[in-house]
Amino acid sequence: MSNRKTKGNSAVHPECLSQVQRILRERFCHQSPHSNLFGVQVQYKHLIELLKRTAINGESNSVLIVGPRGSGKTMLINHALKELMEIREVSENVLQVHLNGLMQINDKIALTEITRQLNLENVVGDKVFGSFAENLSFLLEALKKGNRANSCPVIFILDEFDLFAHQKNQTLLYNLFDISQSAQTPVAVIGLTCRLDILELLEKRVKSRFSHRQIHLMNSFDFPQYMKIFKEQLSLPEEFPNKVFAERWNENTQSLSEDSTVREVLQKLFNVNKSLRSLHMLLMLALNRVTVSHPFMTSADLMEAQHLCSLDSKASIIHGLSVLEICLIIAMKHLNDIYEEEPFNFQMVYNEFQKFIQRKAHSVYNFEKPVVMKAFEHLQQLELIKPMERTSVNSQREYQLVKLLLDNTQIMNALQKYSNCPTDVRQWATSSLSWL
C-alpha cells in the first residue's frame, strides 16, 4: 500500500495509527522519557544540582517542591532522577526510596516500605528495635561500605508530603531531616506538596532540622506559550517510522493550532485550568476518536473532548433517576431554599413531598412511605446526599440529618435534559416558596 494518500478519508495502515496512539498516549500520561519540561527550566536546574551534590559529593540535602495539582511536580522530579541515573557512577551507587502519604499512613508502614525498597529485609530479620530512629539508623548503617565517602547515598521522595505532617509526632519527617543534618549516610529528602502553608504544619523540632529550601511551580506561562505547548504535545517526533504520515500529521496539527474554533476551545480550558494535566486529558479524549477511517484529528474532535471534560458527573446521574427520586431532589431543593442550606432529614423531605401530592391531587405519585424511604436511601448511595454525622445503631433513619450535594443550577439544568419528565413536576421545581 502506498504511503502517498490524500488527507481525506484515505486509508492509513492500522500499524501506523497504532504507533501514533502509543507515542502520544505515553506522552499524555507522563510515561514518555522524551517529554519536554515547560516553563520550569530554572526550577529543574536547581533540583538537578541539589541531587548531584548528594549523589556525587555525598552532601545531604532537603527540599520541598510546592505547586498546585497538575503543575508538574512529579514530572520535574522524574526528569531529574532520569538524568541523574544516566551518570554511570551515580546509577551504580545511589538508591531511591519513594513514599506516598496516601499509602504509608503511619511510621510502621513507612519503615516496612523503606526496608523493602532498600532490599534490607534479610538484614533486619527478626531484630527488635527500641525506636523508629534506631531502626532507620540501622537501615542506613547497613548500606555503608566502610566510611562515609563509600556510603550509598539515598534519595527519599515523599509524595503528598503534607499528609506525613499530619501523622503522629511527625516521627518519620523528624528522623529523615535529622539524618540529612547529621554526618551519617548522605541522604536527600525531596517532599512534594500542593500546600503553600506546608511549613506551618511542621512541628518546631522538625522545622529546625529542615533546610527551608523550596522550589515553587506555578504554571506561569501565558496563552501563546500554551498554544505552543499544544502543538508540541500533539506533534510526532522526527524519528517516526512513516515520514510521510508524520509530516501530514504535523501539518494537520499546525492547521489545528491556527483554527479559530480550536483556539476558542483551548482559551476556555486555559481560563478554567491551565495545568498540563487538563490539556493532556483533552488531547487524550480527542485522540480516542482517531481511527483508520478518520486518521487526522479535527476541531470537531476537540470540541467533543471539551464537552466530555466539562460534563457534570452528578448532573449526569440525575438523568438516570426515577420520577420519585427526582421529586425527592426537588423537595430537598425547596428545603434548601427555605432553610438556607441547613441540614434536613427524611421526614422533612417526605412532608414536603406530601404537600406536592396534596396540592396536585395526583394518586400516581402517592407512594407508600417505605418506598419513598428506599428511594431516599438510593440517593444517599449515589452520593447525591450525604449524612452529616455517623449513623448509630439506635438512631431512627428518618431523623438522621443529611445535606444535598447538588446546587439549584445543577438540578434545573439536569431537569431540562431529563426525558419524559412530567410537566407538573417540572413546574414544581421552578416554583418558589409559595408552595408552603
Swiss-Prot record:
Gene3D superfamilies: P-loop containing nucleotide triphosphate hydrolases
Main location class: nucleus
Keyword Cell inner membrane: no
InterPro entries: AAA+_ATPase, ATPase_AAA_core, ORC4, ORC4_C, P-loop_NTPase
Modified residues (N6-methyllysine): 7
A GO term for molecular function: ATP hydrolysis activity
Subunit details: Component of ORC, a complex composed of at least 6 subunits: ORC1, ORC2, ORC3, ORC4, ORC5 and ORC6. ORC is regulated in a cell-cycle dependent manner. It is sequentially assembled at the exit from anaphase of mitosis and disassembled as cells enter S phase. Interacts with DBF4. Interacts with POLQ.
Subcellular location: Nucleus
Any GO BP: DNA replication initiation
Species whose genome carries this gene: Cricetulus griseus
UniProt-annotated binding residues for ATP: 67-74
Entry superkingdom: Eukaryota
Entry's family note: Belongs to the ORC4 family.
Keywords linked to the UniProt accession: ATP-binding, DNA replication, DNA-binding, Methylation, Nucleotide-binding, Nucleus
Free-text function comment from the UniProt entry: Component of the origin recognition complex (ORC) that binds origins of replication. DNA-binding is ATP-dependent. The specific DNA sequences that define origins of replication have not been identified yet. ORC is required to assemble the pre-replication complex necessary to initiate DNA replication. Binds histone H3 and H4 trimethylation marks H3K9me3, H3K27me3 and H4K20me3.
Gene Ontology CC terms: nuclear origin of replication recognition complex; nucleus
UniProt name for this protein: Origin recognition complex subunit 4
